[in-house]
Amino acid sequence: MTPILDLQQRLVEAGRIRTGASTPGQSGRKVPKKLETFRLTSRERGRIEAAAKLFGGTVQQWEGQWEVYTETNEIPCLIPPGAQFSQWYELWSGGGCTRRCDGHHEYLSDGPCLCPGEYDEKRELASKGKACKPTTRLNVILPDVPGIGVWRLESHGYYAAVELSTMVKLIEQADRKSVV
């Protein structure tokens, strides 16, 4: 089989692994809340029902999809080969991603990064929607959940940004040396 060379190859997204949820704040606007266990969401009810049997929790509808707040903070997963990890500073608005940078270069405008260079100042402005947030994405396979596809874990946290990339590199290196 010969792939089309100018199209990115990928597995279908089966669902999302979430570490937070939104709760109503004092002003009526939604406020993010960190969870102690994982929350899984998918467009396919059967995947969420299977996950609930494995990891506990009750299946419910959520924004046109299905979700389960699991009862576990550990989920067995596999990292498929290829580009399954990405990190950017990103700023989103109602119209989509407005900035995507690496801390120096902003790729959507092909210009310099517009955010402050100092992390604490950037974090403060990001909390107000005025600067980019670190955005770390990792695609994994949940081998015990039926179906083919990846589950995307996305984090905007500092520790995910500084630790996950090193963990993925370590796992890939160990795999190349047949340690895993």
Regions found by a protein language model. Give the residues of each.
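Conserved small/polar residues in nucleotide/adenosyl-binding loops
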Residues: 179
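A recognition module on extended beta-rich or small alphabeta surfaces enriched in W/G with H and D/E
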Residues: 174-176
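Short acidic, glycine/tyrosine-flanked loop/strand segments centered on an H-E-D-like triad
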Residues: 134-171
